[in-house]
């Protein structure tokens, strides 16, 4: 992919010592060169306007949280085999289909009047300097969960405000087995402790 991409791609790697998402994201942030970081997970299929939507939604002093539609196992197999080459919110096999509808005017209304949503680390964007200012992800988060929510708390506490992007930045999440969640309780407690600070 690095050889065919029209934009520079740098693969950041670390040894597989369990689920250490916070640590690898920090390595990627440190290696990044741009002023603005759009963070996605590797199991997403991005709608063609995804990057453009994020750039239009970016504001100084803010970070962006988006969402994703969930694709069933059957539809994922069809996509990966090449049987299906494009996705639509109306297709059978897409859950949370309201998350994959792109209506730019509704995005403005939702941001202005809609509720603040819980962050999804699979679809977020930040100014690099803001991430450095709050010292990036807390690498004490081991295993699945809550590292993204805890980061958002620290960003908010540093007067960097959340902008919820809905009806733009469309992404489809491929089906896969869920990560081991044995560390979830300690991660949740660590997140709750950050709220009290």
Task: Give the residues covered by each predicted segment.
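Acidic donor-binding segment of Leloir-type glycosyltransferases
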Residues: 1-18
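Glycine-rich, basic loop-to-helix element that forms the pyrophosphate-binding segment
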Residues: 15-32, 49
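Short aromatic/hydrophobic "clamp" motif used to bind/position activated sugar donors
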Residues: 37
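The conserved acidic donor/metal-binding loop of glycosyltransferases
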Residues: 41-45
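Conserved donor NDP-sugar-binding/catalytic core segment of glycosyltransferases
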Residues: 49-86
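Short, flexible, basic/aromatic active-site loop/helix in glycosyltransferases
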Residues: 84-116
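A short, conserved alpha-helix in the catalytic core of glycosyltransferases
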Residues: 119, 123-135, 141-161, 166-167
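Active-site donor/metal-binding and catalytic loop motifs
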Residues: 165-182
């Amino acid at each position: 992919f690095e050889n065919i991409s029209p934009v520079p791609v740098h693969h950041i790697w670390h040894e597989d010592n369990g689920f250490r998402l916070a640590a690898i994201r920090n390595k990627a942030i440190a290696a990044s060169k741009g002023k603005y970081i759009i963070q996605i997970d590797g199991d997403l299929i991005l709608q063609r306007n995804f990057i453009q939507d994020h750039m239009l939604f970016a504001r100084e002093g803010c970070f962006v949280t988006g969402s994703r539609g969930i694709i069933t196992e059957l539809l994922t197999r069809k996509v990966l085999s090449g049987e299906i080459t494009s996705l639509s919110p109306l297709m059978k096999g897409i859950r949370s289909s309201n998350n994959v509808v792109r209506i730019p005017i509704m995005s403005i209304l939702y941001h202005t009047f809609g509720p603040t949503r819980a962050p999804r680390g699979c679809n977020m964007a930040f100014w690099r300097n803001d991430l450095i200012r709050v010292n990036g992800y807390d690498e004490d988060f081991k295993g699945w969960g809550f590292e993204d929510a805890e980061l958002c708390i620290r960003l908010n506490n540093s007067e960097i405000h959340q902008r919820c992007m809905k009806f733009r930045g469309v992404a489809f999440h491929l089906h896969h087995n869920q990560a081991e969640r044995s560390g979830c309780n300690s991660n949740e407690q660590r997140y709750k402790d950050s709220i009290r600070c």
